């Protein structure tokens, strides 16, 4: 089956943040027309292969790391540029990136047709193991249990990690369950959760071999 072009570009400017996001759910070439960055903050979350382009610049290293993992294992191409009020804290940057990513995902996905709709993913990272289940249901709901104990990982507040996932489910209008089943290192617990979510999303948006809406209602989103 030939996929529709599932791409989107989102620009969001507020008094707190400036964000630009380009996304393609099936990888390939993407670009941002006019960069808002004077220069890249870091090359840590930057990767270009024959099938994906990923460049994440939020100013928060651990957030960049998590977004990079999500994009890589979802099969997305993703460019994120963000200038946030980090002199205050990480809240607005994380929240507004989340808003932009959710908007971009929903816009790129478009009508839910010809896809599996449901996705399940497991991902280990050393001692940590996480599970994610996704339903492209148009019924936003999230149950998140990561069991994080630290206040921060790098410069990212741990309370913002489940908040981002809950907000993603609400704005993207998906049902989302993400659990870290075991693990004692909060970095590993978080990263395995984002990777499990990526695996689940990749399955949910993959072709089911038809052009049908995967619902007894005949419509989703």
From Swiss-Prot:
EC id: 4.2.1.19
Q: Does the keyword Disulfide bond apply?
A: no
Q: Which UniProt keywords apply?
A: Amino-acid biosynthesis, Histidine biosynthesis, Lyase
Residue stretches spanning the membrane: none
User: Per its UniProt record, what InterPro entries does this chain match?
Assistant: IGPD_sf (IPR038494), ImidazoleglycerolP_deHydtase (IPR000807), ImidazoleglycerP_deHydtase_CS (IPR020565), Ribosomal_Su5_D2-typ_SF (IPR020568)
Q: Which GO molecular function, any one, fits this protein according to its record? A: imidazoleglycerol-phosphate dehydratase activity
Which pathway does it serve? Amino-acid biosynthesis; L-histidine biosynthesis; L-histidine from 5-phospho-alpha-D-ribose 1-diphosphate: step 6/9
Known PANTHER family for this protein?
IMIDAZOLEGLYCEROL-PHOSPHATE DEHYDRATASE, IMIDAZOLEGLYCEROL-PHOSPHATE DEHYDRATASE HIS7
Protein name, UniProt field? Imidazoleglycerol-phosphate dehydratase
Species assigned in the record: Kluyveromyces marxianus
Task: List the lineage, top down.
Answer: Eukaryota, Fungi, Dikarya, Ascomycota, Saccharomycotina
Q: Encoded by which gene?
A: HIS3
